[in-house]
């Protein structure tokens, strides 16, 4: 059985995602698609607009065979951590033949060339990067300039200016790191750019769709303008659950975040993942002006500190994700803060194995995939939390973090929409 893996957020599941699944199956000739999906929090450092089980159901109705949850440590991490965590899980399943991702470039050879340079970090390139960083340039800009000079090909370095290209390169780096046999495929992105805020006729970005849902001209019109941008099943799911479990936004968590910030000092803040000394000092200095999560990110951002990086750091503070959380626990063993650091001062893993794969839902007709995973995987497959026993200490810590994050998300839903609280142990698998 040939299986293609897809790493996604589906925030929400739209026509572009449907196209990606269809193309992934067609281009690879795979029999089924397994999706590793972010849970209730996503990589830009924010809650997903809809709960993970709802988004998982939409993806299953859209043609995915099995949905696994990407642990929150990875789902709200830097592009490098996001990609390496996801690839680690797919690699540990032992039955994934292909990894298919969207890319503005779509040229796997060019992406692989950049991945090789960024993985090996030749001394000349490393020195060029350090020179750019010393000039005070933000890391993405410094890296692109260094690559342009190193490769003598500005068009090649320009590939890094697009977010899906950047993430695709991180997937390729991770495949190299784990010496994975999984074969990568890049699907050229169609329609709007990742960060485009306007709807288009073909494939609009998730950003544009979220903005329209969150800012309707009238409450009853929240989905009328985006109905054509979503597969019918996804549109129906979102519409039926509107104002009962969605939409959820950053600012719904503002009071919780403010409380956490009031409990911290400048020195304690630097214990959290992605919080530098500079950011910690800015948080403390501006804390009295905190109004909402989003406005606080705007207040804190600088040329070097982007909105997304700040938001991601604030999410780590809210969820209690510290740099030392897994420092002594294989397969993580974090060393220093990374993401914007070159050379050896990076998060590294002491093993090529992930910790677990947790099922959110599957199609009944594709239960053979679960059997293959159970046969070939080197990590536990968790279908019921109550059955997740005999886990290593690191696995239990990571799983507890997922449970806490989802219970926190559910608490916001309960408070915002007046619905009964359903804890993570009570939630049912999505089976269609």
Where are the regions that the model predicts?
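N-terminal catalytic cores of NTP/NDP-binding nucleotidyl/phosphoryl-transfer enzymes
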Residues: 1-55
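Short, contiguous strand/loop micro-motifs
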Residues: 8, 42-43, 59, 73-74, ...
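Class I S-adenosyl-L-methionine
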Residues: 25, 56-60, 173, 210
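Non-catalytic positions within long, well-ordered alpha-helices that form the structural scaffold/packing
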Residues: 25-26, 60, 87, 91-92
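Short, high-confidence coil segments that cap the C-terminus of an alpha-helix
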Residues: 28-30, 64, 95-96
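Generic alpha-helical scaffold signal
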Residues: 49-53, 61, 76-84
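A glycine-rich helix N-cap at a beta->alpha junction
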Residues: 56-71
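Active-site cores that bind ATP or allylic diphosphates and position pyrophosphate for catalysis
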Residues: 69-432
């Amino acid at each position: 059985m040939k299986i293609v893996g897809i790493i996604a957020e589906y925030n929400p599941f739209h026509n572009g995602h449907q196209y990606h699944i269809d193309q992934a199956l067609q281009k690879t000739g795979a029999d089924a698609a397994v999706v590793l999906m972010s849970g209730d929090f996503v990589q830009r450092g924010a809650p997903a607009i809809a709960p993970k089980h709802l988004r998982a159901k939409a993806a299953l109705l859209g043609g995915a065979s099995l949905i696994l949850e990407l642990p929150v440590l990875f789902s709200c991490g830097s592009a490098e951590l996001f990609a390496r965590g996801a690839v680690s899980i797919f690699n540990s399943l032992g039955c994934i033949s292909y990894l298919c991702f969207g890319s503005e470039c779509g040229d796997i050879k060019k992406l692989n060339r950049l991945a090789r340079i960024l993985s090996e970090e030749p001394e000349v390139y490393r020195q060029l990067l350090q020179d750019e960083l010393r000039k005070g340039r933000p890391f993405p800009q410094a890296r692109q300039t260094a690559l342009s000079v190193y490769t003598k090909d500005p068009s090649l370095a320009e590939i890094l200016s697009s977010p899906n290209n950047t993430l695709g390169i991180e997937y390729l780096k991770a495949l190299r790191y784990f010496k994975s046999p999984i074969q990568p495929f890049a699907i050229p992105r169609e329609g709007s750019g990742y960060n485009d805020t306007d709807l288009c006729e073909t494939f609009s970005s998730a950003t544009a769709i979220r903005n329209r849902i969150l800012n309707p001209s009238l409450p009853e019109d929240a989905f009328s303008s985006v109905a054509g941008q979503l597969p019918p099943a996804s549109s129906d799911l979102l519409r039926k659950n509107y104002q009962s479990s969605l939409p959820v936004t950053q600012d719904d968590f503002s009071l919780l975040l403010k409380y956490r910030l009031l409990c911290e000092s400048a020195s304690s803040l630097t214990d959290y993942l992605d919080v530098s000394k500079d950011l910690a000092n800015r948080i403390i200095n501006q804390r009295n002006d905190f109004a909402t999560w989003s406005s606080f990110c705007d207040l804190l951002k600088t040329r070097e500190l982007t909105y997304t990086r700040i938001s991601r750091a604030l999410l780590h503070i809210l969820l209690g994700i510290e740099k030392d959380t897994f420092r002594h626990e294989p397969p993580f063993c974090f060393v220093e803060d990374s993401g914007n650091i070159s050379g050896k001062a990076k998060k590294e893993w002491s093993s090529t194995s992930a910790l677990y794969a947790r099922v959110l839902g599957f199609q009944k007709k594709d239960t053979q995939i679960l059997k293959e995973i159970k046969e070939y995987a080197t990590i536990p497959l968790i279908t019921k939390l109550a059955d997740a026993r005999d886990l290593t200490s690191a696995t239990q810590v990571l799983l507890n973090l997922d449970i806490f994050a989802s219970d926190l998300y559910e608490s916001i839903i309960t408070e915002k929409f007046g619905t009964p609280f359903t804890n993570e142990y009570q939630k049912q698998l999505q089976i269609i």
